[in-house]
């Protein structure tokens, strides 16, 4: 039987990136991984993931959770390094 770890292993994003999408959309586990995979296959999906993680960082900073914002920033930095098509304005 396929479990969450198997699904995360098939996803093109890291666990931290999937968690950020899940945080943004208020879903966890399989739902977050499925959404992440779906977004990465859309034409502007990587840019949407970029936007979601940026919004999560802003939300963490607004509630003074600097440590969480730091972790999200690290996830964003890795995401942008591995998915340059996610940059705003890229086609």
Where are these regions (language model features)?
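Long, non-catalytic architectural segments outside compact domain cores
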Residues: 1-52, 71-91
């Amino acid at each position: 039987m396929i479990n969450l770890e198997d699904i995360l292993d098939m996803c093109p994003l890291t666990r931290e990136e999937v968690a950020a999408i899940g945080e943004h959309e208020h879903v966890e586990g399989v739902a977050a991984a499925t959404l992440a995979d779906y977004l990465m296959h859309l034409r502007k999906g990587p840019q949407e993931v970029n936007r979601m993680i940026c919004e999560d960082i802003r939300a963490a900073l607004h509630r003074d959770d600097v440590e969480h914002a730091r972790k999200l920033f690290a996830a964003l930095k890795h995401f942008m390094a591995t998915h340059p098509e996610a940059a705003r304005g890229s086609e």
